[in-house]
Amino acid sequence: MDEIDIGLFDRDWNNTLYYFILNADEQIYLRYGGRDSKAPDSYLDLNSLERALEKGLELHQQYREGKLPKRERPKALFPREIPLLVERTLARSACVECHLIGDFQNLQREQAGTLDKLKHLYRSPDLTTLGIHLDVPKGLVVKDASGAVRAAGVQAGDRISALNGLAVWTFGDLQYELDRISRDAKSVRLSVERGSEIHEFAIELPERWWWTDLTFRQWSVEPRVYFDSRPLSEAEKVQRALNKSGFASEVTHVDMFAEMMKSHQLRVGDVIIAIDGVDQDAVANTAELYIKLRKSAGSTVTLNVLRGGQRMEMPLKTYRLSFRK
């Protein structure tokens, strides 16, 4: 990737396979690839790839005939412009491998104070959070609609054709455009083909619609906490006389790493009430999410914990991963 324009070929770099269908004028017709947090190949299929390639040829013919408007070329960006990536690769006469790019971009942003964790860590929001379940071999045909999209009127059999007015031809296109939506957005416009008609729906985005499991990404900038938790319901908070708007959460799993490294002394069933005295956040609904969003990897925090009806404080040391090839 040493001389590749990663500004033009912009994507979520934590993908196993990713294709760009483009022409000699560097006009990208469509993308093919993408994944979810469950598996690297959830949306990869030979039939859908064939459909994508056929659509690419169709769009190319339209472009040659002047029927497809030319898009503005993205600003160029090369690996040599990311100092920490250069230090890790080019300065050591090593290759810039694609899986290094996203992590070192985030390290560079962290150093520069421009890291937006909602945008840069929680990449490629999951379509199923919106209620979109695709018939993968058929590309963007909806197999089942639930949640927000069903409430808006999307039906099984619809073919998704645009997001916020931008044409999408593949899962890769749709995921890429969804990833570009501001995490503060409350709604998006989804266009679908239904028979011979085009329908547009206003989709109300669920709370924390951008959240995904980060485990497979192995971000260096993500504080590793080595426990899982679930948010308490409002009734559970009232029962324990806790802040109804707070992020109090019950520990559901403690990783063996925490026990081995003694990074914290949490137990399953503990309720984390606050972090460093803070019990409420505009975004986070659990203690672990609060730490990931508001603390730096490698920092130590003080937990306010409720255990068996008794309140206590304990330290928790987060860990920073060193990116491994």
Where are these regions (language model features)?
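The canonical Cys-X-X-Cys-His
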Residues: 91-102
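Post-cleavage N-terminal segment of exported redox proteins
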Residues: 32-88
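Thiol-based oxidoreductase modules, predominantly thioredoxin-like and allied folds used
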Residues: 1-4
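PDZ-domain C-terminal substructure recognizer with occasional recognition of PDZ-binding tails
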Residues: 161, 177-214, 264-267, 273, ...
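Short Cys/His-rich "knuckle" micro-motifs
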Residues: 105-109
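PDZ/PDZ-like domain segments forming the peptide/carboxylate-binding groove
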Residues: 123-162, 166-169, 223-274, 278-281
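A short, hydrophobic beta-strand/beta-hairpin element that forms part of a small beta-sheet core
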Residues: 15-35
